[in-house]
Protein backbone atom coordinates (compact mmCIF):
# COMPACT_ATOMS: atom_id res chain seq x y z
CA UNK A 1 0.00 0.00 0.00
CA UNK A 2 0.95 3.64 -0.47
CA UNK A 3 0.54 6.72 1.70
CA UNK A 4 0.37 10.03 -0.15
CA UNK A 5 1.37 13.54 0.95
CA UNK A 6 0.53 16.82 -0.78
CA UNK A 7 0.64 20.50 0.15
CA UNK A 8 0.62 24.01 -1.27
CA UNK A 9 -1.93 23.47 -4.02
CA UNK A 10 -3.28 27.01 -3.56
CA UNK A 11 -6.59 26.03 -5.15
CA UNK A 12 -8.55 28.99 -6.48
CA UNK A 13 -11.34 29.37 -9.07
CA UNK A 14 -9.05 31.27 -11.44
CA UNK A 15 -6.57 28.39 -11.73
CA UNK A 16 -8.65 25.69 -13.39
CA UNK A 17 -5.48 23.83 -14.41
CA UNK A 18 -4.54 23.24 -10.78
CA UNK A 19 -8.09 22.25 -9.89
CA UNK A 20 -8.34 19.73 -12.73
CA UNK A 21 -4.99 18.20 -11.80
CA UNK A 22 -6.18 17.90 -8.20
CA UNK A 23 -9.48 16.30 -9.22
CA UNK A 24 -7.71 13.73 -11.40
CA UNK A 25 -5.27 13.00 -8.58
CA UNK A 26 -8.10 12.43 -6.12
CA UNK A 27 -10.12 10.19 -8.45
CA UNK A 28 -7.35 8.18 -10.06
CA UNK A 29 -4.55 8.05 -7.50
CA UNK A 30 -5.64 8.98 -4.00
CA UNK A 31 -8.60 6.60 -4.19
CA UNK A 32 -6.13 3.69 -4.26
CA UNK A 33 -4.00 4.96 -1.37
CA UNK A 34 -3.85 3.72 2.19
CA UNK A 35 -4.14 7.32 3.41
CA UNK A 36 -3.79 10.91 2.18
CA UNK A 37 -2.13 13.68 4.16
CA UNK A 38 -2.67 17.31 3.13
CA UNK A 39 -0.04 19.46 4.85
CA UNK A 40 -1.59 22.89 4.45
CA UNK A 41 -2.28 25.60 1.89
CA UNK A 42 -4.81 23.49 0.05
CA UNK A 43 -6.50 26.77 -0.88
CA UNK A 44 -5.04 30.06 -2.06
CA UNK A 45 -6.97 31.49 0.87
CA UNK A 46 -9.78 29.92 2.90
CA UNK A 47 -12.00 32.59 4.39
CA UNK A 48 -14.25 30.30 6.39
CA UNK A 49 -16.13 27.01 6.48
CA UNK A 50 -19.36 28.79 5.56
CA UNK A 51 -18.06 29.21 2.00
CA UNK A 52 -20.79 27.65 -0.16
CA UNK A 53 -19.62 28.82 -3.57
CA UNK A 54 -19.70 26.22 -6.39
CA UNK A 55 -15.90 26.05 -6.28
CA UNK A 56 -15.79 25.33 -2.55
CA UNK A 57 -18.54 22.73 -2.91
CA UNK A 58 -16.63 21.00 -5.68
CA UNK A 59 -13.55 20.63 -3.49
CA UNK A 60 -15.67 19.42 -0.57
CA UNK A 61 -17.30 16.82 -2.79
CA UNK A 62 -13.94 15.43 -3.88
CA UNK A 63 -12.84 14.92 -0.29
CA UNK A 64 -16.21 13.48 0.70
CA UNK A 65 -16.08 11.00 -2.17
CA UNK A 66 -12.58 9.93 -1.16
CA UNK A 67 -13.32 9.42 2.53
CA UNK A 68 -16.60 7.67 1.70
CA UNK A 69 -14.62 5.22 -0.44
CA UNK A 70 -12.67 4.27 2.68
CA UNK A 71 -9.48 6.31 2.29
CA UNK A 72 -8.70 8.34 5.43
CA UNK A 73 -7.65 11.94 4.84
CA UNK A 74 -5.67 13.98 7.36
CA UNK A 75 -5.23 17.74 7.19
CA UNK A 76 -2.81 20.20 8.78
CA UNK A 77 -3.67 23.89 8.45
CA UNK A 78 -1.29 26.09 6.47
CA UNK A 79 -0.73 29.81 6.54
CA UNK A 80 -3.45 30.32 3.91
CA UNK A 81 -6.13 27.99 5.26
CA UNK A 82 -5.75 28.26 9.02
CA UNK A 83 -9.47 29.09 9.21
CA UNK A 84 -10.42 25.68 7.83
CA UNK A 85 -12.14 24.07 10.78
CA UNK A 86 -14.34 21.35 12.17
CA UNK A 87 -17.35 22.17 10.01
CA UNK A 88 -15.35 21.48 6.84
CA UNK A 89 -14.08 18.28 8.44
CA UNK A 90 -17.58 17.08 9.33
CA UNK A 91 -18.85 17.80 5.83
CA UNK A 92 -15.99 15.98 4.13
CA UNK A 93 -15.01 13.27 6.58
CA UNK A 94 -11.39 14.42 6.88
CA UNK A 95 -9.48 14.59 10.17
CA UNK A 96 -7.86 17.83 11.34
CA UNK A 97 -4.45 17.32 12.95
CA UNK A 98 -2.38 19.55 15.23
CA UNK A 99 0.03 22.04 13.64
CA UNK A 100 2.91 19.70 14.44
CA UNK A 101 2.35 16.01 15.06
CA UNK A 102 3.93 12.59 14.69
CA UNK A 103 2.60 9.61 12.78
CA UNK A 104 3.65 6.00 12.37
CA UNK A 105 4.67 5.50 8.76
CA UNK A 106 5.27 1.81 8.13
CA UNK A 107 6.98 1.35 11.45
CA UNK A 108 8.89 4.64 11.49
CA UNK A 109 7.95 7.60 13.65
CA UNK A 110 7.72 10.71 11.48
CA UNK A 111 7.03 14.36 12.34
CA UNK A 112 4.78 16.22 9.90
CA UNK A 113 3.84 19.91 9.73
CA UNK A 114 3.04 22.64 7.24
CA UNK A 115 6.48 24.18 7.64
CA UNK A 116 5.89 27.87 8.27
CA UNK A 117 6.81 27.51 11.94
CA UNK A 118 10.30 26.43 10.86
CA UNK A 119 10.95 29.78 9.13
CA UNK A 120 11.88 31.56 12.34
CA UNK A 121 14.25 34.01 10.61
CA UNK A 122 11.22 35.70 9.04
CA UNK A 123 10.38 37.66 12.16
CA UNK A 124 7.67 39.76 10.53
CA UNK A 125 5.79 36.70 9.33
CA UNK A 126 6.10 34.93 12.69
CA UNK A 127 4.60 37.97 14.40
CA UNK A 128 1.76 38.00 11.85
CA UNK A 129 1.18 34.29 12.40
CA UNK A 130 1.05 34.74 16.16
CA UNK A 131 -1.56 37.49 15.76
CA UNK A 132 -3.93 35.74 13.35
CA UNK A 133 -3.88 32.56 15.45
CA UNK A 134 -5.19 34.37 18.51
CA UNK A 135 -8.46 32.60 19.47
CA UNK A 136 -10.26 35.85 20.27
CA UNK A 137 -9.38 37.34 16.87
CA UNK A 138 -10.55 34.24 15.02
CA UNK A 139 -13.76 34.27 17.08
CA UNK A 140 -14.48 37.83 15.93
CA UNK A 141 -13.53 37.15 12.30
CA UNK A 142 -15.86 34.15 12.07
CA UNK A 143 -18.79 36.41 12.99
CA UNK A 144 -18.07 39.14 10.45
CA UNK A 145 -20.36 39.28 7.37
CA UNK A 146 -19.01 37.41 4.36
CA UNK A 147 -18.57 40.45 2.11
CA UNK A 148 -16.49 42.21 4.76
CA UNK A 149 -14.33 39.10 5.22
CA UNK A 150 -13.55 39.09 1.52
CA UNK A 151 -12.42 42.72 1.66
CA UNK A 152 -10.19 42.06 4.66
CA UNK A 153 -8.63 39.00 3.03
CA UNK A 154 -8.01 40.88 -0.24
CA UNK A 155 -6.15 43.58 1.67
CA UNK A 156 -4.12 41.03 3.62
CA UNK A 157 -3.18 39.16 0.44
CA UNK A 158 -2.03 42.38 -1.21
CA UNK A 159 0.14 43.15 1.80
CA UNK A 160 1.64 39.66 1.79
CA UNK A 161 2.58 39.93 -1.89
CA UNK A 162 4.25 43.30 -1.35
CA UNK A 163 6.09 42.01 1.71
CA UNK A 164 7.48 38.98 -0.14
CA UNK A 165 9.02 41.19 -2.81
CA UNK A 166 11.28 42.75 -0.20
CA UNK A 167 12.42 39.54 1.52
CA UNK A 168 15.42 37.41 0.68
CA UNK A 169 14.93 33.74 -0.18
CA UNK A 170 17.07 32.79 2.80
CA UNK A 171 14.78 34.55 5.26
CA UNK A 172 11.72 32.78 3.85
CA UNK A 173 13.35 29.34 4.05
CA UNK A 174 13.50 27.10 7.10
CA UNK A 175 16.04 27.61 9.85
CA UNK A 176 18.20 24.48 9.97
CA UNK A 177 18.74 24.72 13.72
CA UNK A 178 14.97 24.90 14.23
CA UNK A 179 14.54 21.82 12.03
CA UNK A 180 17.06 19.89 14.12
CA UNK A 181 15.47 21.10 17.35
CA UNK A 182 11.98 19.95 16.33
CA UNK A 183 13.24 16.57 15.16
CA UNK A 184 15.15 16.13 18.41
CA UNK A 185 12.10 17.19 20.44
CA UNK A 186 9.96 14.50 18.83
CA UNK A 187 12.77 11.92 18.65
CA UNK A 188 12.42 11.31 14.91
CA UNK A 189 14.80 10.79 12.01
CA UNK A 190 12.34 11.86 9.30
CA UNK A 191 10.42 15.12 8.85
CA UNK A 192 7.90 15.93 6.11
CA UNK A 193 6.68 19.47 5.45
CA UNK A 194 5.66 21.94 2.76
CA UNK A 195 5.32 25.75 2.73
CA UNK A 196 8.65 26.78 1.17
CA UNK A 197 7.83 25.60 -2.38
CA UNK A 198 11.30 24.06 -2.61
CA UNK A 199 10.69 20.35 -3.19
CA UNK A 200 13.68 18.29 -2.19
CA UNK A 201 14.92 15.45 -0.02
CA UNK A 202 17.61 16.66 2.38
CA UNK A 203 19.94 14.24 4.18
CA UNK A 204 22.02 15.65 7.02
CA UNK A 205 23.45 14.83 10.42
CA UNK A 206 22.72 16.22 13.87
CA UNK A 207 24.40 14.95 17.03
CA UNK A 208 25.92 12.18 14.90
CA UNK A 209 22.49 10.95 13.83
CA UNK A 210 21.52 10.67 10.15
CA UNK A 211 18.33 12.67 9.54
CA UNK A 212 16.09 13.26 6.54
CA UNK A 213 13.83 16.21 5.72
CA UNK A 214 11.41 15.89 2.81
CA UNK A 215 10.02 19.14 1.41
CA UNK A 216 6.81 18.87 -0.59
CA UNK A 217 6.40 20.88 -3.77
CA UNK A 218 3.83 23.49 -4.73
CA UNK A 219 1.28 23.04 -7.53
CA UNK A 220 1.81 26.29 -9.44
CA UNK A 221 3.22 24.72 -12.61
CA UNK A 222 2.60 21.01 -11.97
CA UNK A 223 1.27 18.72 -9.30
CA UNK A 224 3.65 17.44 -6.62
CA UNK A 225 3.11 14.23 -4.67
CA UNK A 226 5.16 12.35 -2.09
CA UNK A 227 4.56 8.61 -2.31
CA UNK A 228 5.59 6.52 0.69
CA UNK A 229 5.55 2.73 0.92
CA UNK A 230 7.10 0.23 3.29
CA UNK A 231 10.03 0.05 0.87
CA UNK A 232 10.79 3.77 0.62
CA UNK A 233 9.61 7.10 -0.72
CA UNK A 234 9.65 9.17 -3.89
CA UNK A 235 8.85 12.82 -4.57
CA UNK A 236 7.04 12.96 -7.90
CA UNK A 237 5.52 15.52 -10.27
CA UNK A 238 2.12 15.36 -11.91
CA UNK A 239 1.74 17.32 -15.18
CA UNK A 240 -1.25 19.56 -15.73
CA UNK A 241 -3.76 18.31 -18.26
CA UNK A 242 -3.98 20.20 -21.52
CA UNK A 243 -6.92 20.16 -23.88
Curated annotation (Swiss-Prot):
It comes from the Bacteria. It catalyses: UDP-2-N,3-O-bis[(3R)-3-hydroxytetradecanoyl]-alpha-D-glucosamine + H2O = 2-N,3-O-bis[(3R)-3-hydroxytetradecanoyl]-alpha-D-glucosaminyl 1-phosphate + UMP + 2 H(+). Pathway: Glycolipid biosynthesis; lipid IV(A) biosynthesis; lipid IV(A) from (3R)-3-hydroxytetradecanoyl-[acyl-carrier-protein] and UDP-N-acetyl-alpha-D-glucosamine: step 4/6. It is found in: Cell inner membrane. Keywords: Cell inner membrane, Cell membrane, Hydrolase, Lipid A biosynthesis, Lipid biosynthesis, Lipid metabolism, Manganese, Membrane, Metal-binding. Mn(2+) 1 binds at residues 8, 10, 41, 197. Binds 2 Mn(2+) ions per subunit in a binuclear metal center. Mn(2+) 2 binds at residues 41, 79, 114, 195. One of its GO terms (cellular component) is extrinsic component of plasma membrane. One of its GO terms (biological process) is lipid A biosynthetic process. CDD domains: MPP_YbbF-LpxH (cd07398). It is an enzyme of class 3 (hydrolase). The keyword Manganese applies. Belongs to the LpxH family. Hydrolyzes the pyrophosphate bond of UDP-2,3-diacylglucosamine to yield 2,3-diacylglucosamine 1-phosphate (lipid X) and UMP by catalyzing the attack of water at the alpha-P atom. Involved in the biosynthesis of lipid A, a phosphorylated glycolipid that anchors the lipopolysaccharide to the outer membrane of the cell. HAMAP family: LpxH. This is UDP-2,3-diacylglucosamine hydrolase.
Amino acid sequence: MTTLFISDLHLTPSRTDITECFVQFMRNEAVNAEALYVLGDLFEFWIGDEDCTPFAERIRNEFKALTTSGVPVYFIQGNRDFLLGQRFCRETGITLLDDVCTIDLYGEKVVILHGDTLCIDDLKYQEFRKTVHQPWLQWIFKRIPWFIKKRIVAKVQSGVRDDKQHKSLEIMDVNQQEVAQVMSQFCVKLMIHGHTHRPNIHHFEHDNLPLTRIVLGDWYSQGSVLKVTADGYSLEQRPFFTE
